[in-house]
From Swiss-Prot:
Signal peptide: none annotated. GO terms for molecular function: molecular condensate scaffold activity; mRNA binding. Residues 173-192 are annotated as: Disordered. Belongs to the EDC3 family. It comes from Schizosaccharomyces pombe (strain 972 / ATCC 24843). Stimulates decapping of both stable and unstable mRNA during mRNA decay. Stimulates decapping presumably by preventing the DCP1-DCP2 decapping complex from adopting an inactive conformation. Together with pdc1, acts as a scaffolding protein sufficient for the phase transition of the components of the 5' to 3' mRNA degradation machinery to form P-bodies. Intermolecular interactions between the edc3 Sm domain and at least 10 helical leucine-rich motifs in dcp2 and pdc1 build the core of the interaction network of this spontaneous clustering process. Residues 222-431 form the YjeF N-terminal domain. This is Enhancer of mRNA-decapping protein 3.
């Protein structure tokens, strides 16, 4: 039995200051511990439970007085009339015993309630993303150990925060010697335009340049993994982790410390970030803020501002970032340096575009500058051929989706380097969803190549 069972009951509340209030219980706010009464004059009174000294349930046939609250200064005439009125209504026959919550709680049948929940739940347990519903792997890859370690380490040694950016530089610098050949930007575009967007088989495994094996996951699984990480930590932590990874990748692409050193007399690089409406929109703005803090000029081109945390936009502008409100091309003409890099964050890991996104994709391709796509090149779909953005690099935040893995098979020969970054949300988050094999371990960033296994 809960407080809700007493809604509509007439009660008399004795407060700590010896004042009384009579009324009908209309609501109880359990989070703030506030009891709400409707007094005789149809007004409402809210009482904090810590101020209640005693509470008495009145008979239903008892008539409440017009004044719901009586103060200690009530005159003797009113007290006498109240006593006379109470005797006429047989108040003396009321029960003064305390309510036994423990005894009434035992009347609550928990088993019956949970049985009703199970009857109403029509979901198929086999479709739930729970680790015990996942079929274990029967066959092992030739590079995998058949016998696992006998003792599982509770802590994993990870690189220090100071070595993170050096690790990204090392991965980028070795990309030309790995499975992917960067080539020239112009050559990449010509080859990409000749490649049709055919329905290739989704690769079962992803092989990194260091020999590790990852497995692609669906966009829905990636979305659930990020949502679970936010539930365990906070939105700000997940956003800042993604922003740090993206900003350090851009920093390395632009040349790192040598490009931004005071000894370099070239103008500051200008980066344009195309931001759409998706889960990583706020992370893209936060990455732009971090780039502004180290001397890189950043301009945002927002598809819509409604999916971005307003705090991130304010902090971005406070750091020196640009959010043009006028014609974008006219704004660029006022700047002293041209755009050096376009960061494509239009669609996130859901490959869908609208008319506005299509126009921005055409605009970015016509700039003939370096392009970095986040999660997946915008405009790519597995259903039909669409005009897609033509990046030199693609950075997957968290894990590689099956859509990106399929796109990489088509575009990899054209010189598109695909990377996957660890969001730092912890392996337990992904293990709960049964997709731990999608995570990069031992490093913050890894370059991948897709090979289908049959």
């Amino acid at each position: 039995m809960s407080v809700a069972d007493f809604y509509g009951s007439n009660v008399e509340v004795l407060l700590n200051n010896d004042s009384k209030a009579r009324g009908v219980i209309t609501n109880f706010d359990s989070s703030n511990s506030i009891l709400q009464l409707r007094l005789a004059n149809d007004s409402t009174k809210s009482i904090v439970t810590k101020d209640i000294k005693d509470l008495r349930i009145l008979p239903k046939n008892e008539i409440m007085p017009k004044n719901g609250t009586k103060s200690p200064s009530t005159n003797s005439t009113k007290l006498k009339s109240a006593e006379t009125y109470s005797s006429k209504n047989k108040w003396s026959m009321d029960c003064d015993e305390e309510f036994d919550f423990a005894a009434n709680l035992e009347k609550f049948d928990k088993k019956q309630v949970f049985a009703e929940f199970r009857e109403k739940d029509k979901k198929d347990p086999a479709k739930l993303l729970v680790s015990h519903n996942k079929s274990p792997n029967r066959n092992y890859h030739h590079k995998q150990n058949v016998l696992g370690p006998s003792v599982k380490d509770e802590f994993v040694d990870l690189p220090s925060a100071g070595s993170q950016i050096n690790g990204i530089d090392a991965v980028l610098s070795s990309s030309s010697n790995g499975h992917v050949t960067p080539g020239s930007k112009k050559g990449s575009r010509e080859t990409l335009k000749k490649k049709p967007f055919v329905d290739e088989n989704i690769p079962a495994e992803l092989h990194t340049t260091t020999g590790d094996i990852l497995k692609p996951i669906t966009p829905e699984q990636l979305s659930q993994g990020i949502a679970l990480a936010i539930a365990k930590t906070s939105t700000d932590i997940v956003v800042e982790n993604a922003a740090q990874l993206l900003s350090q990748f851009v920093f390395s692409v632009l040349g790192g410390h040598k490009r931004l050193s005071s000894r370099n007399h070239n103008s500051q690089p200008l980066v344009c970030i195309l931001v759409g409406s998706h889960d990583h929109a706020s992370a893209a703005v936060a990455a732009g803020r971090r780039l502004c803090a180290i001397g890189i000029k950043v301009v945002l081109r927002l598809l819509t501002p409604f999916n971005v945390d307003n705090r991130q936009l304010l902090m971005f502008q406070a750091a020196g970032g640009y959010i043009p409100t006028e014609n974008f091309d006219q704004f660029l003409n006022k700047l002293t340096s041209p755009i050096e890099l376009v960061v494509d964050v239009l669609t996130g890991f859901h490959p869908s575009i609208d008319k506005n996104s299509h126009a921005l994709i055409q605009w970015a391709n016509d700039l003939n500058v370096l392009i970095l796509s986040v999660d997946i090149p915008s405009g790519y779909t597995v259903q039909k051929k669409n005009t897609a953005i033509l990046p030199k690099w693609t950075l997957a935040l968290g894990a590689v989706t099956t859509t990106l893995a399929q796109a990489a098979l088509v575009k990899q020969a054209a010189g598109v380097s695909v990377f996957v970054g660890n969001l730092g949300t912890g392996s337990q988050t992904w293990a709960e969803l049964g997709i731990l094999e999608s995570q990069v371990t031992g490093q913050y960033l890894a370059q991948i190549s897709c090979t289908s296994t049959n």
